[in-house]
C-alpha cells in the first residue's frame, strides 16, 4: 500500500485491529471482471467520475492509485484537487461525484459512524439514509457490553458494505515525535493531543 506502515487497510469504520471490527466481513478481493460486467450491464462501460480531493500531497498520490486501479475496470477517474474549506462546502452542498476525505477517528466506534452515516448526520455528505442502520446504531449506543454492541454493529456493517455509501480504504496510524525534554505526553487512539499534564523541562 502507498502509505506503507503508516496506515492499516480497512473496509469498515474501525480498523481490523479494533475490537469492534466485524471480522466475518473482511476486505473483499478485487474482481475486475465482475466490475466490467456490471458496468456493461448498466450500459456505461466507461463512466467518467470526478474525484474531489483536498490539496494534500498524500491525498493526490492515493487518488492517482485509485485512478489507475479503477481504469482497469473501465472507470475514467478525473481528479479534482480542491482547497480544504472549499471541498467541505462542495461536499455539504452535494456538489461532487465522489469525495475522498478522512476522519480523525474516535475512541468509541459510534463516533466514527453516527455523525457520518446517520440519516440526519452533520457529515452525511452522501445523503445516505437507512432507517434500520439508524435503529441499530441507536441500540448499540445505549449498551455497554461489547458483545451486545457487536451484534448491532454486525447488522450495520452488512448494510454499509452492501449499500456502499462510503468505501473505506485505510486507517492512519498516529505517529508522534517530541523532544526528550517533554514529559507527560500520552497518545490516544483518536489521534487528538491532550495538553493536560504536559511539561517541558
What feature does the model see in each segment?
Residues 76-89:
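Early extracytoplasmic/lumenal segment of secretory-pathway proteins
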Residues 32-50:
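Immediate post-signal peptide segment of exported/extracytoplasmic ligand-binding proteins
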Residues 46-55, 77-80, 97:
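Short, well-ordered beta-strand elements
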Residues 43, 74, 95:
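Conserved functional loop/turn residues at catalytic and ligand-binding sites
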